[in-house]
Amino acid sequence: MKRKTKVTMNDIARAAGVSQATVSLVLNQSRNIKLSDDTRQRVINVATELGYDRLPAVHAPRNQEEIALLVSSMQSFDPFIDAISQAREAAWRNETLLTVYDYGDDIELALNIIRQLEKRNCIGIVLASPVTTLVDMTAFQDCTRIPLVLLNQRDPGSPLLPSFIPDDYANAFQVTKHLIACGATRIAHITGESWMEASRQRLAGYQAALQQAGLACDDDLVRQTNWQFSESFTATTSLLELAERPDAIFCASDWLAIGCYQALAVNGVRIPQDMLLAGYDDQKISEQLTPPLTSIQLPYSELGRLAVEYLCNQEDAATHVTLAGRLKVRASSLV
């Protein structure tokens, strides 16, 4: 007898003509992202027609165990959406409902949500950020007896609070080492705002790889931006104006890399013949650029799954999981 093929969210997305992120948001019953009622209903109808067996009830049973995922902000195009998708899948595998709340970086709202969760059969809370960062959990101390873990953020002052984050240091080291292996000796780095833990760790990983290879860490080759295309364009232009140009550029995000592509094109610099280029976080658009962009795929899917499984298994030991991503080598860094 032929085994029935499992219906995935990718299958639903293709049939409904929407993204997997949209399917995830609809099936999670998230109301904090502006989706039309028609889109929501189309996704539910397609999921039903395909035989998707994990459709949540509109009203969960009173005794249904749930895990709440509170995220400081959520944008459907962000790779972090993969963490939410896999967290939901892990919850369902453990016969638990995952509910998602976007608290808009409003601590008072987050605390109010947690107080409401105390009245329900909530077995765990995942406090998440779409941006890898350090967080001060002082405001959340003693606010609940519900087990709580951090996803994509950590609090150095709370060593007993479990956290699950990507290893930005190791990832940046991996990208820079790849560019060096491809023959680059003057590698520039276009990064984000210095207050962000992600920016600091990526810069540190980049510098460590240079030092290991015996290459100088030249401050003139580092450009700080606020993550905007226009600033990346300006930063790249200024690098090209140096007396000794870089032969490779490592951008701390794929969005920064887009501004870099534009500046290089305007100045007649070819990728990769004249300049090797690599990005970070493996946005969907990275494969569509010309040439396709080498980037780091962040392990958000696994981190989201591990955070939920930790709560479902009711583990007591403090856990701090840091996972490296996967280098996706494409034509932008290959001569």
What are the functions of these language-model segments?
Residues 71-82, 100-109, 163-174, 190-235, ...:
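Hinge/beta->alpha junction and helix N-cap segments in small-molecule ligand-binding domains
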Residues 19-24, 36:
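Short coil turns linking two alpha-helices in DNA-binding domains
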Residues 186, 217-221, 271-276:
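Short acidic capping loops at alpha-helix termini that bridge into adjacent secondary structure
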